[in-house]
Amino acid sequence: MEISRVEALSQHIVQPYAWGDAVWHVWGASQGVEQSLEGQTMVAASNASKQPLVLLHGGSGSWTHWLRNVEHLAKNRTIWALDIPGFGDSDLPSGLSDADGLVPYMAEILTHTFSGDAVDVMGFSFGGMTAGLVAAQYPNLIRQLILVGAPGLGLFGKELPMRGMTPDMDEEAQRKVHRHNLNAMMFVHPDSVTDDVIDLQQANVARDRLRRRRIARTDVLAQAQTRWQCPVHGVWGACDALYQGTLSQVPQVLSSMATFTVVPDAGHWVMFERPDAFHGVVDPLLSR
């Protein structure tokens, strides 16, 4: 399976904190990443010329949201894909319920991992909103931020026809719900929802313990931009279901963005549905 192949190319890093473990997958570190017994992560000196890029996944996700991108991006960067606390294999801090509560934990992880140095961050959807809040409260930690289909702008279009699970559903019925929801929210083309994608979605949703999405429907990210000190870029799919009828308003609401690019023929999960076109947009940004 593609997930197993791509994961096998990575280095798996588990960092212990007082609240639990944070889990990274790292690609492109030519001599690997060293980790002390205390969990301190140290980037090998030989990689100093290959700048790190932190990838933050979307809601109900994990590093696998970047499955079709990490190999390409690792050609020029050391890729650090985090399972955000409460998702994937990372632990959920006690009492945490939404993205705003994540900010100090994310700041702790970035500070610990990169010794307080500012790094480039690319965040998809929920991960982009979270990164934007970190950039506002801890501007010294992020050198450049790329937002991909981020919520928190107060621009949600019509309500999506999402379906829920019920206790009596068998495996086949659950997969039908996942297929429906992926088509409704994540993709513009039904043939993008393969059996492997449903497997990926099932595995990610099962590990989502941060179930609240309260602030995603507010304008919290738009409000945060007044405190950004780094360059911020936006990349959206032209057919993003979260922005039906409102996509054209994004650059006005996020007026502090340095650039805003719309990828044609792509849904919300733009970097998965149209990876080549997505790379064509972000590669020049990451060369800066």
Residue ranges and their predicted role:
Residues M1-L53, A74-R77, E108, F114-S115, ...:
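Alpha/beta-hydrolase fold catalytic core
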Residues G20, G28-V33, M42, L67, ...:
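Active-site loop/oxyanion-hole signature of alpha/beta-hydrolase fold enzymes
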Residues K50, G58-G61, S125:
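Active-site glycine-rich loops that stabilize anionic/oxyanionic intermediates
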Residues G58-R68, I79:
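Serine-hydrolase catalytic-loop signature spanning alpha/beta hydrolases and amidase-signature enzymes
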Residues G132-A136, I142-A173:
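Flexible "cap/lid" loop of the alpha/beta hydrolase fold
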Residues E172-C230:
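Conserved alpha/beta-hydrolase catalytic His-Asp/Glu region
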Residues H233-A266:
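Conserved loop-alpha-helix segment in the C-terminal half of the alpha/beta-hydrolase fold
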Residues A266-P275, H279:
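Catalytic histidine-centered segment of alpha/beta-hydrolase-like enzymes
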